[in-house]
Amino acid sequence: QGSPNYGEGPVPEAMWISEVTFYCQAGFRHLLMSGVYERFPKLKYILTESGCGWVGDMLKQLDRIDIGFKHGSIGEMNYQRMQWVLKDKPSEYAARNCWYGASFPSKADLNGIDEIGEDRVLWGNDYPHYEGTFPYNLESLRLTFAGMSETRRRKLLGLNAAALYKFDLAKLAPLAAKHGPTPAHVNGPLPRDEIPG
């Protein structure tokens, strides 16, 4: 992802975690704006560990830039010699070619899901990293997914990944039945006194 080396100072992990999404977003922007998906229309790009709450706003920004270039309204900048390579809007390439692996997303992170499409988001728990949700995966799921429709929840928690990676759901069914969780496990809200401290 191109993150810098933060060295041995007192807070390198804090610096890294505060900027990690920036570097993920940079690659995402570069691929969308450079015409990669125009040249490789079957390419699938999956961002992981960067959430998805920011995607809708970024796609709106990139679409505005695209329109500006196509209609010559970028302001005082002169781009007449530049050949614009995008036939479609950046948001249209994202809708066809991009997915978002949201590691232990919060409810706020999923607020913009309708803008990017519920079929584009994949849940993750970031195991075995210490900042992930293990061993409190079920509690995390309840905090985020309680009250969400079962159809949407099933898509985010597994069906989207199964479709993207072409998993054989019939072969995976025994494992899912053994290891869960079931809809009943995650549908109820998590009371404050059950939140791990």
Predicted regions located by residue number:
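Residue-level detector of alpha-helix boundaries and kinks
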Residues: 14-17, 21, 97, 126, ...
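Histidine/acidic residue-rich metal-binding segments in metalloenzymes
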Residues: 1-93, 107-119
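Short, flexible loop segments at the rims of nucleotide/cofactor-binding pockets, characterized by
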Residues: 22-25, 98-102
